[in-house]
């Protein structure tokens, strides 16, 4: 099957390409920069350079494609403007996919709080999902929380914070819960979603990992994997606007990316149902094994100082 992977220079897109090749698919990539594709180590002869926000290159990228993976985000643009950019990109992609006759669209989005109150980041993910679910006959949206992997920006952010802060000052969100998922399991879901039978398509699936934990517990378990001790100080308030700037500086990350991610910590992010692994036939990795694998992969290319 001929498939398109958008965001092919990103963590998930770059890792997905070889998995799709192994499954026997013919893969085309879509990205904004050939330099970023090369830097990500993506081995693809067929890459269309374009921009989903403007629509440039989408027609050529989607031509002759049976299934498309939508892995695009715009969170590193202007802090106040990324939701509008993400919606614009999704609608342009949806229009181009309908025109090209794409049969299936697979989207990786984010878990939504049970109370429906979402951060800007998660509200934007939901708006993108809604646009894409109308764009093909067989759409599938996969909703994940934190993806644990060597190139996952959210995981790397947590590791760098734990490395560089001798004491972890944890706001009120420390007691909120989530279900982080191994990057390998995320990729397996994506591959299987591309060819899943008709009873799996047409809506969204929540793909959490098997271990539910508070954010405080997650930080403690990562610190344990790093073999370091990090005492924590509980704070009574959520100081996300200020804390995100400080945390981004400490971790060496872009504040435009970190601010919306930290806003998402202010709610429980748990799967609505636990049937996705059974439905897709996937055996999930436990959290500690996922962290250890991610750290080992990271150390192949870069020093993780605490180890």
Predicted regions and their residues:
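Mid/C-terminal beta-alpha module of Rossmann-like enzyme folds, strongest
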Residues: 2, 189-260, 271-307
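N-terminal Rossmann NAD(P)H-binding glycine-rich loop of SDR-like oxidoreductase domains
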Residues: 3-25
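SDR active-site strand-loop-helix element
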Residues: 6, 30, 71, 105-110, ...
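Oxidoreductase cofactor-interface core, primarily capturing Rossmann-like NAD(P)-dependent enzymes
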Residues: 16, 23, 40, 115-228
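NAD(P)H-binding glycine-rich loop region in Rossmannoid oxidoreductase-like domains
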Residues: 29, 34-100, 110-114
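Conserved cofactor-binding/catalytic machinery of classical short-chain dehydrogenase/reductase
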Residues: 54, 89-92, 104, 127-128, ...
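A short helix->loop->beta-strand "cap" motif at the edges of active sites that frequently abuts
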Residues: 99-104, 136-137
């Amino acid at each position: 099957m001929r498939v398109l992977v958008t965001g092919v220079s990103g963590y998930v897109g770059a890792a997905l390409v070889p998995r799709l090749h192994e499954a026997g698919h013919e893969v085309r990539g879509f990205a904004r920069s050939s330099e970023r594709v090369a830097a990500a180590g993506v081995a693809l002869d067929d890459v269309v350079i374009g921009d989903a926000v403007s629509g440039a290159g989408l027609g050529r990228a989607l031509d002759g494609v049976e299934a498309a993976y939508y892995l695009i985000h715009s969170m590193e643009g202007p802090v106040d403007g990324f939701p509008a950019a993400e919606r614009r990109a999704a609608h342009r992609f949806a229009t181009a996919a309908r025109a090209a006759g794409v049969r299936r669209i697979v989207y990786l989005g984010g878990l939504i709080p049970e109370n429906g109150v979402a951060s800007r980041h998660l509200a934007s993910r939901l708006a993108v999902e809604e646009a894409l679910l109308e764009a093909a006959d067989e759409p599938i949206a996969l909703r994940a929380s934190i993806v644990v992997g060597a190139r996952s920006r959210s995981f790397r952010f947590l590791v760098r914070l734990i490395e560089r802060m001798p004491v972890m000052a944890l706001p009120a969100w420390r007691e909120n819960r989530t279900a982080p998922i191994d990057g390998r399991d995320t990729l397996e879901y994506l591959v299987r979603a591309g060819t899943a039978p008709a009873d799996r398509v047409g809506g969204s699936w929540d793909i959490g990992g098997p271990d539910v934990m508070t954010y405080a517990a997650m930080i403690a378990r990562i610190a344990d994997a790093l073999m370091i001790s990090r005492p924590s100080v509980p704070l009574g308030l959520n100081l996300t606007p200020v804390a995100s700037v400080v945390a981004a500086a400490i971790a060496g990350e872009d504040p435009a990316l970190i601010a919306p991610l930290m806003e998402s910590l202010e709610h429980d992010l748990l799967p609505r149902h636990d049937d996705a692994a059974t439905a897709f036939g996937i055996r999930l990795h436990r959290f500690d094994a996922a962290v250890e694998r991610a750290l080992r992969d990271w150390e192949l290319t870069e020093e993780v100082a605490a180890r």
